[in-house]
Amino acid sequence: MNTKVKIDKLNVHFGQTHAVKDVSIDVPENTVTAIIGPSGCGKSTMLRSLNRMHDLFPNARVTGKVLLDGNDIYDRKVDPVSIRRRVGMVFQKPNPFPAMSIYDNVVAGYKLNGRVKKSDADEIVETSLRRVALWDEVKDRLKSNSMELSGGQQQRLCIARTIAVQPEVILMDEPASALDPISTLKIEELIEELTEKYTIIIVTHNMQQAARVSDYTAFFYMGDLVEWGETKKLFTTPEKKQTEDYITGRFG
């Protein structure tokens, strides 16, 4: 199986705080990798280092390498915007652009990169919304404001907006934590379907969700990668006692 993202001795500092400590992971292509661990363990910090979002914070310092198809995304010659186009992000709280329609939300990324023909935009919108199983629910009101959608629909719209620009990797930071159980199920089913085309890395507090949706799991504690491996093995026969204590609820 090809490695899509290779994380090599990655460290992330915020001022004097060492948030992610010397982490190395190989993420296989077209799989789901879950990042689990207690609050404040570095999960989201780790995730956001994979598309250079920490560049936006002046006190952040990243060392080590993140290789996307063998090329270091932190190389000085690499444009961070081009990386964020290849590595999309879906946040914890649905964040559709509130002043835009459903239609305009989906094509927003394309419009940032230049003019788009109406026929091309129509195709992008339909294809993206179909891929997230939202087309049939909204096809008759594409010009309606995106804020009229339910929370679950808004999150699927955000995923549609992400995949519309054709990324290769999708990062998800607790994408279902703010949703009801039915919407959560739809997001989980969607994640499974999306791996046919994308590599997905998801942060979740919900260990049952990690077990359901992921192929591989990384357990973090206090900025350290404690254990990484196939999800089924990690949840049934973990190698480290700290991992076992966490997944059995002894701490966290």
Curated annotation (Swiss-Prot):
Entry's EC annotation: 7.3.2.1
UniProt domain ABC transporter: residue ranges: 5-247
Function: Part of the ABC transporter complex PstSACB involved in phosphate import. Responsible for energy coupling to the transport system.
Gene Ontology MF, one: ATPase-coupled phosphate ion transmembrane transporter activity
Protein name: Phosphate import ATP-binding protein PstB
Assembly information from the UniProt record: The complex is composed of two ATP-binding proteins (PstB), two transmembrane proteins (PstC and PstA) and a solute-binding protein (PstS).
Keyword check for Ligase: no
Recorded superkingdom: Bacteria
UniProt-listed Pfam families: ABC_tran
Catalytically driven reaction(s): phosphate(out) + ATP + H2O = ADP + 2 phosphate(in) + H(+)
Membrane topology: Peripheral membrane protein
Cytoplasm listed as a keyword: no
Alphabetical UniProt keywords: ATP-binding, Cell inner membrane, Cell membrane, Membrane, Nucleotide-binding, Phosphate transport, Translocase, Transport
SMART domains linked: AAA (SM00382)
GO biological process, one term: phosphate ion transmembrane transport
GO cellular component: plasma membrane
Subcellular location: Cell inner membrane
Record: residues binding ATP: 37-44
Sequence similarity: Belongs to the ABC transporter superfamily. Phosphate importer (TC 3.A.1.7) family.
InterPro entries, A to Z: AAA+_ATPase, ABC_transporter-like_ATP-bd, ABC_transporter-like_CS, P-loop_NTPase, PstB-like
SUPFAM superfamilies, per database record: P-loop containing nucleoside triphosphate hydrolases
